[in-house]
Amino acid sequence: MNFDTIIIGGGMAGLSCALRCLEAGLKTAVIASGQSALHFSSGSIDVLAKTPSGKHVINPMDSLETFSKEYPSHPYAALGKETVERAINWYKTTLSAIGVPLTSQKDGLNHYRLTPLGTMKSTWLSQPFVHQFPMDLEKNKTQKMVLITIDGFRDFQPKLAQDNLKQITQLSDLEIATASISLSAFNDIQRNHCELRSIDISRLLSKRANRQELAYALQQHANPGDLVVLPSIFGNGTGLSYLREIEQLTKLTLCEVPTMPPSLLGIRLEESMKHAFIELGGTMLNGDHVVQGEFSYVDKSDPEHSHYRLNRLFTKNHGDFPLQAKQFVLATGSFFSQGLKANVDSMIEPIFGLDIAQSDKRTDWYSHDFFSTQSHPFLSMGIKTTANFQAIKSGHVIDNLYCAGAILSGYNPILEGSGSGVAISSGFHAAESIIEQLQCSDSLQNNNTKAEVAL
């Protein structure tokens, strides 16, 4: 099979890159081995919440230029402010067009979102029913919050969230109540309702009668003007419309919080992007993974300074039938997604054996304290690339293999709150670079053809 672009990895970076390539008319394939980290995500888009030194960032876009000068090895420094802004705005527009509107504060500031543990986390874009608390919590206008769960649901504990919220001094005037709701639909299932996860409950709530029962129960515990916090139990596709329906029935203000995995807020993003990719004509190879790539030298006359070129891939499911493309993108994630692996004394990129930016001593990989405020150094390690995010193998640049997302080195997405921002921006940048190269190549071919005809 031949493509213009093959993207390895079906997470945020890979799908962002794939959608942009399809927009430009490129024949594109995505190879996804399984569930991405989006199944464990909040469903909000973090651009930059903290600097590596731990300083809080209030306005991420305005901070990017200074941030890039202070941390020149960070992916944002290589991308530049203009590219990051274009990428995030493009993503926001794209997701809105496919049914998942994302909004930020009008003044461009980060906002706080509520976590299932009752803490506040800084982010930049959130989905429609994720309540945006101001960064200055003393300006919070909500007077009463009602934390409500489904009876027996284990992945959201209102009492725990309530206790943690009461520890936030800026919210000392906020009245916080909790409640648990039971659904009669539990009587019709054969499983113990305490075993149900968010996906199971979302299936029950796909029936209008069950949603109406939920709406009535909510009205027994809250009044208009209250902020009603629910675990994310409404799936993709019709999930947002169900929430709007319940809000209209109850006249309550609803707030979704991500649950312990699986997170339907994150799944909503992934499934929406995958659906759009397939609808636009993309090829999705689910449940497959690349086992090796076939390379060639660009300049054999000077092996020491020669570049590599990736010609084709072999995957587990396709066996001896290779997948060929003009350009490739590696977006397989970090250790969590097995895009990187660690041995006793070294880290490896398991597909192509790419060069890794890592410390030689294993003792330098981690901090002495497990819960260190500075996090662990291994979280900032990843693939060595050029400034244009082209991969490097044995010291040689691979001209047509770009890297994007958590596999990149030089940043700590967990500490910084920059994971989604880097994923989207680097995926978008890879797509833009590929589009430019292929358009130049096609233009050159057309000019050569015209010249031959003229002769």
Curated annotation (Swiss-Prot):
**What reaction gets catalysed by this protein?**
a quinone + sn-glycerol 3-phosphate = dihydroxyacetone phosphate + a quinol
Q: Which cofactor does it need?
A: FMN
Q: Its pathway?
A: Polyol metabolism; glycerol degradation via glycerol kinase pathway; glycerone phosphate from sn-glycerol 3-phosphate (anaerobic route): step 1/1
Q: What is its EC number?
A: 1.1.5.3
A Pfam match: FAD_binding_2
Sorted alphabetically, the keyword list is: Flavoprotein, FMN, Oxidoreductase
Which InterPro entries does the UniProt record give? FAD-dep_OxRdtase_2_FAD-bd, FAD/NAD-bd_sf, G3P_DH_GlpB_su, Metab_Enz_Cyan_OpOx_G3PDH
GO BP annotations listed: glycerol catabolic process
As for what it does, the entry says:
Conversion of glycerol 3-phosphate to dihydroxyacetone. Uses fumarate or nitrate as electron acceptor.
| PANTHER family xrefs | ANAEROBIC GLYCEROL-3-PHOSPHATE DEHYDROGENASE SUBUNIT B (PTHR42949:SF3)
Q: What is the protein name stated in its UniProt record?
A: Anaerobic glycerol-3-phosphate dehydrogenase subunit B
Q: What is the taxonomic lineage of the source species?
A: Bacteria, Pseudomonadati, Pseudomonadota, Gammaproteobacteria, Vibrionales
The encoding gene is glpB
